[in-house]
């Protein structure tokens, strides 16, 4: 039976009455990516090797990817430095809040933001800012941790790595 609610990974991270809808399957995420005009995947440094292998597949499927923090070094080492953007997470958040931002390619802001691998408390603050100040963006946390400030989030799967990777694989299979 599906869980109605998930507890935030950081138990003090209770943002109020509106919390992320729990995602338990990958297909709805893939459908949202396909429907989005401009999806953006934000990748942070808290990523396992297996997660990185999946993120490389998002790059191959022409999803705009931005690496934050030291995550960019993994892409450079894998020969993908030219296909991935780099930004400081806090500055990127400020750009995303501006509906007139032109994006990394000059084509406009993004309507769907997916996040994985960010340090939990950094990602949580980014998602809180988007939730409260960027009505033009839908935010999904496809991370190993439940992020209540996202519109939708995977549950706490940090102890269930295989289950988490299967969800990422489901998304990729549908794209």
UniProtKB/Swiss-Prot annotation:
InterPro entries: CdhB, DHS-like_NAD/FAD-binding_dom
Gene3D superfamilies: TPP-binding domain
Source species, domain of life: Archaea
Family: Belongs to the CdhB family.
Entries under HAMAP family matching the protein: CdhB (MF_01134)
Assembly with partners or alone: Heterotetramer of two alpha and two epsilon subunits. The ACDS complex is made up of alpha, epsilon, beta, gamma and delta subunits with a probable stoichiometry of (alpha(2)epsilon(2))(4)-beta(8)-(gamma(1)delta(1))(8).
Protein name: Acetyl-CoA decarbonylase/synthase complex subunit epsilon 2
Species of provenance: Archaeoglobus fulgidus (strain ATCC 49558 / DSM 4304 / JCM 9628 / NBRC 100126 / VC-16)
């Amino acid at each position: 039976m599906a869980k109605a609610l998930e507890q935030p990974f950081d138990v003090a991270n209770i943002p109020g009455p509106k919390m992320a809808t729990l995602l338990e399957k990958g297909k709805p995420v893939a459908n949202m990516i396909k429907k989005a005009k401009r999806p953006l995947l934000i990748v942070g440094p808290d990523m396992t090797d297996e997660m990185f292998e999946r993120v490389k597949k998002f790059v191959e499927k022409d999803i705009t990817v931005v690496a934050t923090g030291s995550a960019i070094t993994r892409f450079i080492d894998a020969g993908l430095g030219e296909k991935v953007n780099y930004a400081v997470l806090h500055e990127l958040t400020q750009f995303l809040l501006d509906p007139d931002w032109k994006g990394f390619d000059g084509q406009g802001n993004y309507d769907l933001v997916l996040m994985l691998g960010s340090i939990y408390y950094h990602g949580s603050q980014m998602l809180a800012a988007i939730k409260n100040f960027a009505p033009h963006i839908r935010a999904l946390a496809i991370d190993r941790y439940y992020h209540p400030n996202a519109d939708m989030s995977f549950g706490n799967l940090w102890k269930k790595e295989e289950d988490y990777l299967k969800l990422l694989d489901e998304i990729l299979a549908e794209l």
